[in-house]
Amino acid sequence: MTMDADAMETETTDQVSASPLHFARSYQVEALEKAIKQNTIVFLETGSGKTLIAIMLLRSYAYLFRKPSPCFCVFLVPQVVLVTQQAEALKMHTDLKVGMYWGDMGVDFWDSSTWKQEVDKYEVLVMTPAILLDALRHSFLSLSMIKVLIVDECHHAGGKHPYACIMREFYHKELNSGTSNVPRIFGMTASLVKTKGENLDSYWKKIHELETLMNSKVYTCENESVLAGFVPFSTPSFKYYQHIKIPSPKRASLVEKLERLTIKHRLSLGTLDLNSSTVDSVEKRLLRISSTLTYCLDDLGILLAQKAAQSLSASQNDSFLWGELNMFSVALVKKFCSDASQEFLAEIPQGLNWSVANINGNAEAGLLTLKTVCLIETLLGYSSLENIRCIIFVDRVITAIVLESLLAEILPNCNNWKTKYVAGNNSGLQNQTRKKQNEIVEDFRRGLVNIIVATSILEEGLDVQSCNLVIRFDPASNICSFIQSRGRARMQNSDYLMMVESGDLLTQSRLMKYLSGGKRMREESLDHSLVPCPPLPDDSDEPLFRVESTGATVTLSSSVSLIYHYCSRLPSDEYFKPAPRFDVNKDQGSCTLYLPKSCPVKEVKAEANNKVLKQAVCLKACIQLHKVGALSDHLVPDMVVAETVSQKLEKIQYNTEQPCYFPPELVSQFSAQPETTYHFYLIRMKPNSPRNFHLNDVLLGTRVVLEDDIGNTSFRLEDHRGTIAVTLSYVGAFHLTQEEVLFCRRFQITLFRVLLDHSVENLMEALNGLHLRDGVALDYLLVPSTHSHETSLIDWEVIRSVNLTSHEVLEKHENCSTNGASRILHTKDGLFCTCVVQNALVYTPHNGYVYCTKGVLNNLNGNSLLTKRNSGDQTYIEYYEERHGIQLNFVDEPLLNGRHIFTLHSYLHMAKKKKEKEHDREFVELPPELCHVILSPISVDMIYSYTFIPSVMQRIESLLIAYNLKKSIPKVNIPTIKVLEAITTKKCEDQFHLESLETLGDSFLKYAVCQQLFQHCHTHHEGLLSTKKDGMISNVMLCQFGCQQKLQGFIRDECFEPKGWMVPGQSSAAYSLVNDTLPESRNIYVASRRNLKRKSVADVVESLIGAYLSEGGELAALMFMNWVGIKVDFTTTKIQRDSPIQAEKLVNVGYMESLLNYSFEDKSLLVEALTHGSYMMPEIPRCYQRLEFLGDSVLDYLITKHLYDKYPCLSPGLLTDMRSASVNNECYALVAVKANLHKHILYASHHLHKHISRTVSEFEQSSLQSTFGWESDISFPKVLGDVIESLAGAIFVDSGYNKEVVFASIKPLLGCMITPETVKLHPVRELTELCQKWQFELSKAKDFDSFTVEVKAKEMSFAHTAKASDKKMAKKLAYKEVLNLLKNSLDY
């Protein structure tokens, strides 16, 4: 040990005391005590309980890292499969908080704040070593915060393994600096040496190197007998087999057929549209698979070679087996495997006379090798073992796959053993998920699986106590593999069988050394136990770069991987994958690094020793990339940082329960003044067609004067009869006494409650609660008008008709009966004059109905025959007695002509109203004595008019809400109705909604933000610009902005339902109004709460931008955006361009300027706009991606604004469809081909060249002329459309950010713009919406090279499978064909 380490250990161990578990074995306690005193490597047999020692060590040190301590412990394991196993062991034996980490969790993209959350939450972090190494290099974690570092299977520590890098780069550097703040190291292994066949005398050297690197001393038991009492040792033995090749002619024939197949499929590559790199990749795969099949043929036999080919041809996982190949390449490789399978199958007998179980016969025929037969016979020799648990170790994944298949066929005929395979997923031949592997291992533990055929993945860490047989089908590659695979046999009296070819003395000798290797390692460790660990040679002379602010480092050895990682995060497409390019000059000892054009650093040169030239130039590039901000202070690519920020934004919490505001203009506090001033507005309703009833005028009285564009507005209502024009006009202020206000409220409550409820059940409760001493209440009046300005506009006679007594009526109408015009009638309320009840609102308790009366039927009384159809000769007396059990008492009194009360609807909806359900007859005859009089006099026309008032008030309330929002936004004034349109969603089913304004606002927002980012972030590549743009204008952020200004309460997002309408004047107990304060300290009221989606708030922000843009121009839109929190300005700045280039030598400047009708001031912009990322010539500093980013948003906005202005009366949603059909890459690509722009693009991609050539050829043969819509069946390269956008961006920048210049230049290229008559929906959307509308069943399926769509409609099925060069086009073609079939067959 070094002195510094000793000092650290003395200081720590004074406080740490051993915390052994009561069931710990003696050697485990001894190892624990040793580990507390000094850094220790525990070298013990597999199954001896090393993990338990580590757990006890953590228990002893736990006081140092229990939360809230900022410190923690790290438990490193070499394989992902061990993370869960070791974490579960920790949870079982400690109360520590344990976190688990592996690569698939996305930890590569975590930042320091995410790691801080983890270490604040957990006390022990179990992970693979590469994760810790990256976190330390990027300074997300600090070694000084780790109190204990446990290294499982520490024999891996060597070379460039992450274990070794952690120790060299961090632990020893800290130790050599004199600090004592380093973690306690605890290593575990069953083999200190990881060698293949070195002399046993070299073991101490290897052990000493490991001790030095780990700064730890080995602990082991002095004698194997100490362990023998606790750990069962398997009995090793050799199993010999004869290696006899399959019959020579048969083998030669099969090998020749494989070679011919390989040549055939390699030649067929020329018929595919593939670039050179893809061709190389496919050829390598073909050769690799051919080699694999030849290996299976020789080592396993024809039968298993056929199974291997069949397995490879049937694989459905393209990400591992086929890598980055496109669908045609995959199909070709799979066809090769399928053809090879058929060739092997031709050599395998078929029919009842042949059986796979006849292993000896199959061996003679060459179907199985003797090695395979030996394995089967060995397993069958254990048939008497009831609960066998066997692991068969093989070298290759394909061997594991085919042996499992063979054993699954043969063994069930002899016993009930079940076989599975477990193999790693990085071989490129087969993929098996971690979950699937864990399930198989768990089934093995439980006895549901008896045999596992495994690669080395199960050598380390698998803990199955009942495993009683291990077979090495392929010999162990080194002593470590030997010891660990032997240790899998955990059961007493278990066997460890090593299959060896007879006569292979070299392999047998090597395995014999492995058998004695464990003993030799133990002896060497004990003999040198007192030899201190020397300091690790200081390699601090290795160049490195360290960021002072964070401590993040990149070394010479890690710089290359960081550069490749950075380049992998740059924008790419199917024709170009950004990667560094090295120009090495060994004679001069120099290297030039060329980085992709989207990188802010284009070229780096360095001189160094030839051995480290690439590392030296990469280290220098890392320093420069950090300087310009392309690498963060944690040395993470800027794209990763931006994506991490974006991911965090997406996780912002949002509560879907949001308020629904009510306008304060219709709410007031109780006033004790004797008179109250109301401002009255005349509501006049004029139908566009004749109706059965006249619409009377109604007065709206408010406590405040309404804004002019509300108080003098007009709009329309709709019902099944037509439309009704509604106008509001101010008629003046009136002073009402408290008594008059109460009369008005009583009237409107009575009438509206009856209309809403169609009964009087809730009426008395509502009237009993009526008084003028409420706090906050709905305070506006809706009263009938007299149509006369001479006396009073308010019809007080009707208003005062509520709850009149019989005595009052008789006094007022005592002269009616004397002049013969009227008579007295008996009612439920007493005696009334006919002139009172002939125009009244009445209630009949016997059936619970409410009627409005229209006249007296003097020719009918109780003795009259019913006028009802099919009533026969029944009288009214008989009818009421029979039907209702009522005896009429005043049978001579005339009957009333009554009509069922009107049903309230919403008359704001766009949808055509269904004719309301009417009773058997519009009017019925009512005996007066059965009627309660509710209101009188009141005409049917007046009652009919009031059925429209809730809808009228809903519109006025909405306008007032929009006005309140408008008042919150300073400096800019736009029509209130436009604000209302912007806050009304489609769910309201109103005559208008926000979609058109949202489309317009979305395009302007995108344009404004993209322009600002382009100017202010001139070193950012397109991917970074796009990520930042999305972070600024994503739905999450727009919702956040909106909620900060409390926009969510203003949004109209629910269809108006009259039954939910709040009746003005009713007691505040009937509803709840809660005061809320807007950001500018103005009051508003919350009437209710409702569920509101995040996207709805975001849509309203965009639609309000569109509203302010359409009414006030770009400045108004920017002011609104600034108010809501989106800080954007249009101040243009001159961007410093790179040194000028000779544009004429690179592109045809004259032709391009003539085509565009624009002369470039900076012609390098034109070159940049035409340069694809694959064109890596150093004289061109940039590719078109940044200009494309800008031009995309400029064109989108220009076209959307053009369509919005040209067609101002578009129905909501049509603008969105027109924009989608006009602004898309397919349209732009078609424009590029028609203008021959493809001839002027600079690129260096064979794949792109072939794609463009094919596209142009298909276009020339087609009759396609339009430049919009989705008609094209041609799969255009995206590059063609991108160039149109990049040219627009180049003109925009060169012209000083002048949009009109861009539109004047690009519009002629676009040709005829789309119109409402020519717009066509995308077939995917059109078919989807059609199926949703008619409730058809839509299903889809995709394969490597095809897309299938099926629709089941009206017991018919319509399906089509389309193939294309890309999945997107195949999908479109399939949808398009099924859509046409559906339309033609069902006439849609």
Swiss-Prot record:
SMART domains for the chain: DEXDc, DSRM, HELICc, PAZ, RIBOc
Domain (RNase III) ranges: 962-1113, 1149-1296
Domain Helicase ATP-binding: 31-210
Occurrences of domain Helicase C-terminal (ranges): 380-544
Span of domain PAZ: 805-935
Site entry (Important for activity), positions: K1278
SUPFAM superfamilies recorded: dsRNA-binding domain-like, P-loop containing nucleoside triphosphate hydrolases, PAZ domain, RNase III domain-like
Residues in Dicer dsRNA-binding fold domain copies: 559-645
Keywords assigned by UniProt, alphabetized: ATP-binding, Cytoplasm, Endonuclease, Helicase, Hydrolase, Magnesium, Manganese, Metal-binding, Nuclease, Nucleotide-binding, Nucleus, Plant defense, Repeat, RNA-binding, RNA-mediated gene silencing
TM ranges: none
Pfam families: DEAD (PF00270), Dicer_dimer (PF03368), Helicase_C (PF00271), PAZ (PF02170), Ribonuclease_3 (PF00636)
Enzyme Commission code: 3.1.26.-
UniProt: Mg(2+) binding residues: E1188, D1282, E1285
Gene Ontology BP, a term: cellular response to nitrogen starvation
Disulfide bridge map: none
UniProt: ATP binding residues: L44, E45, T46, G47, S48, G49, K50, T51
Major localisation: nucleus
Family: Belongs to the helicase family. Dicer subfamily.
Name of protein: Endoribonuclease Dicer homolog 2
UniProt source species: Arabidopsis thaliana (Mouse-ear cress)
